């Protein structure tokens, strides 16, 4: 059972490459709650991105394929406080952008220490 009294907050801004780019990996002995996962297009052209989830020890499963972000779109929300996403130790999220460094992933995570994991 995670220790719910001790939480570490992690925020990351990750430019997606044109090949698989790690967005977030849940550390050993932790349970994580993705409170926000959003994507932004900073280019002057429409862009797409893929989002994959890999369970610890498993193979990547694509969650979104060629998801479009139009030009001048501020942010596209995938997970937020009303729709969190739970991860276990070793689970990972990764993404691929249609053009290197033009699609930006923004992630906010609560990490809970779990000595039994």
Where are the regions that the model predicts?
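Acidic glycine-/aspartate-rich tracts in secreted/extracellular proteins
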Residues: 42-45, 56-58
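Short solvent-exposed strand-capping/beta-turn motif centered on an Asx-Ser/Thr pair
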Residues: 39-44, 98
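Intrinsically disordered, low-complexity Pro/Gly/Ser/Thr-rich segments with frequent PxxP/GP/PP motifs
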Residues: 58-92
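Beta-strand signatures of extracellular beta-sandwich domains
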Residues: 50-54, 106-108
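C-terminal interaction-tip segments
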Residues: 1-32, 36, 97-117
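A generic structural signal for short beta-strands and their flanking turns/coil linkers
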Residues: 33-35, 45-47, 89-91
